[in-house]
Each structure stands twice: as C-alpha cells, then as structure tokens.
A protein has these predicted regions:
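Short, structured surface patches at the beginning of a domain
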Residues: 1-135
Length: 135
C-alpha cells in the first residue's frame, strides 16, 4: 500500500524563531500522521511525504508539494492520503470539495491524524450536500 502524507504550513514573515516553531510543529504533525497511518494500515507500507513550507496561503492550490500530491492522485499512485487536519489541504470549502471529489474518483482513502477514517464519512456527507447546492 502506498500512503501519502501531506503537510502544509503557511509561513508569514521572516521571524527566525517563528520559522523554527513552524518547522518543529510540522515535524510533530508528520510523525502523528505516520503513526496514525501505521496504526490503521500496519507497518509494511510505503510512506511518501508531500510538504509545503513557505509563503503558500491555504487557498493557493499551486503549492509544489500539493501539485505533486495531486499528480500522484491523478496517476493512481496512492492508496491513502493522511493529513493532520483537513485545513492543511485548504480552508476554502469549494476547493476542499473539488479536491475530495478527485480523491474519491480515484478510490483513494483520505484520513486525518485526529479523526482517522471518520473524516471520510464526514466528507462523503458534505460532498453530497455540496453537489446538491452546486447544481
């Protein structure tokens, strides 16, 4: 099984202490995602990291790590995606639903470190309502 772990941190300003804190937080988040993936899917999986650290606002889906993640989704190179929380993908609900729709189209599971597979149940319900409201 190939599991993608995506982490995004929008750096604001050039404060070295802030940057160090953000990086430490990203490392901790990445470890939590890896541990959650191993807890659900076992130890014998390939883990692939996708990271965006820099001046990349959440609404910008042209982040390098996110583009690489989406390319692997489109090419069916992943079985599971793990994020610490859904807002690491984007805070824009329409962009989140469009992204999730693509993930589901490729039969990829999306879990969060905090909610595990329950995140998909929530997103599946939200996707139905979002599609109804979009029509």
């Amino acid at each position: 099984m190939r599991i993608g772990i995506y982490n995004h941190q929008h750096l604001r300003g050039g404060c070295p202490i802030c940057t160090q804190t953000y990086v430490q937080g990203m490392i901790a988040d990445g470890m939590k995602c890896m541990n959650r993936a191993k807890g659900i899917y076992g130890e014998d999986n390939e883990l692939v990291n996708y990271t965006d650290l820099g001046d990349y606002p959440s609404e910008n889906l042209e982040r390098p790590g996110f583009r690489r993640l989406m390319k692997d989704i489109e090419e069916d190179n992943l079985d599971v995606i793990v994020v610490i929380t859904l807002d690491k993908i984007t805070t824009d609900i329409d962009l989140l639903m469009e992204t999730y729709q693509t993930i589901r189209k490729h039969n990829i599971q999306l879990i969060t470190a905090n909610d595990g597979k329950k995140a998909m149940e929530i997103l599946d319900k939200a996707l139905v309502k979002w599609q109804e409201n979009s029509n």
